[in-house]
Amino acid sequence: HGIEAPEGLDHDMHHMVGWAHPDLVLGQICNLPYRAQFRENVTTLCAIDYEIPGSPAGFYHSVFVVRDDDPAQSPVDAATYRLAYNEPLSNSGYGAPQLWAASRGFQFSPFMHTHAHRNSIEAVATGKADICAIDAHTFWIDRDLELMNSVKVIGRTHDTPGMTLITRAGQDRAPYLVAIRQALEAVPTAIKSELRLRGIVELPASAYDIPMPNIPA
């Protein structure tokens, strides 16, 4: 397709460095760091469609999770709860729940930084935190974990663009989209079914026009 690319992947480069690299061929980025730091400096290609129930193609939402014996019936009931979040620049774990809360006149506080969605679920299950927001796809993948027996879902966030594929700035999107679609066609059906990987969606730029949350230091 006329796309110059190295023979192998660089497994050592930090993802934040990779997204900003002038030779970036293809990257997958969460929409919060994309909006916060990279939107004007990359070529946006498409969003991945994981067939999230209740969300449009190419979009996703997070589910609010509390302990299974918690009396909260909705996230509003948990307004003063300690929020476990994976990363401050995670839309699913931090940005989306805080924007959902802001639309209802509050912010989740205090916080607990866990570095991973699964760690956030464990923090809630073990009582170290009171609530967390987990992207619906990850929650589905982790559905059989034993710790899931100790938590329950009490709500969901608004829909936002799913994991987004990007390349370096100034590139023609067309050959990349053709190559990505052909690569997805070559993935065995069983694997796509296991991941619920339906394909890619070209979203309008306006889909990413979402208010920025206050990012914790």
PLM feature segments, named:
Residues 1, 179-191:
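Generic non-transmembrane alpha-helical segments
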Residues 19, 78, 124-125:
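Hydrophobic residues within well-ordered alpha-helices
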Residues 95-104, 109, 113-126, 147-149, ...:
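Hydrophobic, well-ordered secondary-structure segments
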Residues 25, 29-40, 125, 130-149:
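A ligand-binding cleft/hinge motif common to bilobed small-molecule-binding domains
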Residues 1-35:
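Extracytoplasmic small-molecule ligand-binding "clamshell" domains
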Residues 56-120, 190-202, 209-215:
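Bilobed "Venus flytrap"/periplasmic-binding protein-like clamshell domains
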Residues 46-61, 147-184, 197-210:
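Periplasmic-binding protein-like
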Residues 26-62:
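A basic- and aromatic-enriched beta-loop-alpha substructure that forms the phosphate/nucleotide-
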